[in-house]
């Protein structure tokens, strides 16, 4: 299988439409560009033209939000086929997906919903990730989620769950530092101790982002600057 193809240290950004002019005209010194896979499932048009321009200048990371790896529904064949076609066209350095579910009964909820960290969930995800990797002919990264509920029947921590999933499938991890911090504050655990449950060799990419502070909890909104505690946690990672 094709591994991830970035240097050991590369700093990139999430490419959005407001960035196009600066990226294409000034060519800033970036290690890579990350885009949401689903925004480029059409074979042509302005979006695909922009992505091909980006790919000509930088390595690209395809980050999925809609494969719904943990859904009780079967894996969406049409979605996976579109992703495969995009991967073959763009030849990205990294392919990643959120570790979540986002639909059931054929209805897509347009959200990234958490999963119970149980052996049953682990077996389901291992099979799904194995199929995706076989179909794409490459390893993928899976990303830890921000969550606002905990399941009573969970029998392992999220990071222990991620570590075992990587061991079983050979997939890598996209470690979202902000998501880990948000969950640590909301559920009252030590995020540094959780980092110790992950093998550094399994982490293929990290995300840094901001969150919103409310009276009740932290919400992962990507709507503010990265805060000092998240930077400190990144230093620990």
Predicted feature locations:
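N-terminal capping/small domains of soluble enzymes
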Residues: 8-13, 25-40
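Acidic (Asp/Glu)-rich catalytic clusters
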Residues: 22-28, 45-62, 78-93, 130-135, ...
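Gly/Pro-rich active-site loop or hairpin
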Residues: 42-44, 74, 112-118, 122, ...
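Boundary/entry segment of secreted carbohydrate-active catalytic domains
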Residues: 1-23
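Conserved, mostly hydrophobic/aromatic
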Residues: 33, 95, 176, 206
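Active-site beta-loop-alpha junctions enriched in small/polar residues
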Residues: 16-18, 36-40, 65-68, 99-100, ...
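Active-site acidic/histidine proton-transfer and metal-coordination neighborhood
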Residues: 76-173
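Acidic-and-aromatic substrate-binding clefts and catalytic sites of carbohydrate-active enzymes
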Residues: 20, 37-49, 68-78, 148-156, ...
């Amino acid at each position: 299988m094709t591994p991830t193809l970035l240097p050991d240290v590369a700093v990139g950004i999430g490419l959005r439409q407001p960035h196009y002019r600066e990226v294409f005209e000034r060519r800033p010194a970036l290690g890579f560009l990350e885009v949401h896979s689903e925004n480029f499932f059409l074979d042509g048009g302005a979006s695909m033209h922009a992505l091909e321009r980006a790919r000509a200048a930088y390595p690209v990371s395809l980050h999925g939000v809609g494969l719904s790896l943990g859904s009780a529904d079967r894996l969406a064949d049409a979605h996976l086929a579109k992703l495969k076609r995009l991967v073959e066209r763009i030849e990205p350095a990294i392919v990643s997906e959120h570790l979540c579910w986002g639909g059931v009964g054929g209805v897509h909820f347009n959200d990234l919903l958490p999963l119970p960290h149980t052996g049953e969930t682990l077996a389901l995800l291992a099979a799904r990730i194995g199929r995706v990797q076989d179909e794409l002919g490459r390893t993928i990264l899976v990303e830890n989620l921000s969550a606002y509920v905990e399941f009573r029947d969970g029998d392992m921590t999220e990071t222990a769950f991620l570590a075992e999933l990587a061991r079983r499938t050979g997939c890598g991890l996209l470690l979202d530092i902000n998501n880990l911090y948000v969950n640590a504050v909301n559920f009252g655990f030590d995020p540094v101790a959780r980092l110790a449950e992950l093998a550094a060799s399994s982490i293929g990419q990290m995300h840094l982002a901001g969150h919103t502070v409310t009276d009740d909890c932290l919400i992962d909104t990507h709507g503010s600057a990265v805060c000092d505690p998240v930077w400190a946690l990144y230093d620990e990672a």
